[in-house]
């Protein structure tokens, strides 16, 4: 299943989706990614409950499944569990399925025409745009264009599924689709959100408490969209383990979402209790706050396309007798940077500990002909098929990794305990698992020290997305908006300089609460003028959110 980015849907969510989407015994139904048939089975049961006959159900069910083994399993399970056989299941690419009402243009022989359905359900593959290639990508982009949407760049595959699915639903239909949280609760998810608002009168985004895909690396949302009822857009939480269905629960907040700011405020309301939300709203309006982008140019690190090959340790370098000339010092993982500073001694410790911290770099600054050992290593890469990788196949020379300049500061892209802003006191570069920051501010140490306050850390929790294991992921565009102070303009540089060694030591030990004990009174108290009660409230909100994430 991982080949297709597919993770089997638990029964509780499939039942909730089917019961909500199917409201009449005559409703036609489409499963956009059949898998092993869990949505089909619950749809058949729902139609039976509403009085549909087996024969009618057979004619009302439609579905697409690209995997032949899964397709066969789904048909067998539908027959064994519900007594339903149907000829309306298509073993092929979902983007070949087109509604008859949209079929005026000439079509290829592979196109599967179906009537527009009353209900569309499913759990599309959790895959990135780069994993859709060739004819499948062309078909997906054609379907999106037919829906009247012009893409400005790569989007998540789930967005393509969501848009095409909406084109297969009739004018009074319903849609119940499982998508990764990242598709809707990020800035780059605005395309999906705006499309849902334009296509449907009512959209409910259900955060699935107590339920998830154990194999998947991220949290999910159930999208419930309908072309009936009041015009609303809501986010709500549901605890499926407690038997609560979206049909009976009240939204956390309901309102029209016309602006990015309104969307973000609604999202924050789902994360904080009412008092914490109000406190945060007031705090971030402080006139002495800035955003990180005002003082930093933020970019991703080096993209190798094959880290295991290009980023090695001293043992591999020794084994292949590779000259040190061809390697750059590198930071490959968040766990390699811990304190407020990353020093030459820190890198040497990584090297001595046999950590992957050497980046292969072959460029114009090297001899015209690589050494015999390097040529042998490149030949090994060819035999392993390294150059056929997605990123490498687009390079003029597959082995020439585009290396970014040495950054002033590292920021952990994927963080477990807490995000880290680390001053780079070496010539090391970083991979794209870590963000690069070039600061335009004079006192870099005070600036980075001030980062570790409860308000800024709470903003990181609210801005990022949570992946399995409680990992917090913050994209470069999201990092730009993080609120921070400029210490010099508030007269805090001296106070921060005095506590810098303490902060460095506590960060190295992972003692963030100890760091907040030192920084909050300086930054939030003396700098922003918050009283003790306000500081404690912000800190309590932050620690609660962090605890929920990492548990």
Residue ranges and their predicted role:
Residues 2-3, 8-16, 33-41, 66-72, ...:
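Signature of N6-adenine DNA methyltransferases within the class I
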Residues 52-58, 83-85, 112-115, 171:
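Short helix-terminating capping/connector loops at secondary-structure junctions
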Residues 85-94:
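Conserved SAM-binding strand-loop segment of SAM-dependent methyltransferases
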